[in-house]
Regions:
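Accessory interaction regions appended to the cores of large information-processing enzymes
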Residues: 2-155
Length: 155
């Protein structure tokens, strides 16, 4: 997640990303509904190559709505000052497991997961969390989840 002023590098990046679409990695704005874009302007960038209509509909439906609501939750919580909502832009890198097309999806859980994750990421970004002191103190005690699975030969 990147947050910054629309009249600076983040605004420039949003304009470039939305204007330079890449097949399978569409960049879309976070919206509450087809004609209701959230503030701050939030651009979603998929980390997974989109290959199916079902995946697209889940990403551009449930996930998009969850992210949009998470942004507004962050404004409501004061993590993003309401008076800055029209001046800031957010770029969200989105990962949705490609196997989502092969399982029965609980859209309420997927929505809430993305809503809460977005609000939490914004909170951390706006409060400079984790701090460099925390990172240095906890570096040796923090293991990346998938790295650990690899060590345990579970990948």
């Amino acid at each position: 997640m990147v947050i910054g002023e629309l009249d600076g590098p983040v605004g420039y990046a949003i304009a470039n990303l939305i204007g330079d679409q890449t097949k399978g990695h569409s960049r879309v704005f976070a919206i509450l509904n087809c004609d209701v874009q959230v503030r701050p302007v939030t651009l979603m960038v998929s980390k997974v190559t989109v290959k199916s209509e079902k995946y697209t509909n889940i990403l551009m439906g449930t996930v998009q709505a969850g992210i949009a609501n998470g942004v507004l939750d962050a404004v409501r919580a004061g993590d993003i000052p309401k008076e800055k909502a029209n001046d800031l832009g957010i770029i969200v890198s989105v990962w949705l497991d490609p196997s989502v097309t092969e399982i029965e999806v609980d859209h309420n859980i997927l929505f809430e997961t993305n809503r809460q994750a977005t609000a939490k990421a914004i909170h951390k970004a706006m409060h400079n969390e984790p701090t460099i002191d925390w990172l240095l103190k906890n570096q040796a005690n923090t293991t990346h989840y998938f790295h650990q699975l690899g060590i345990e030969k579970k990948l």
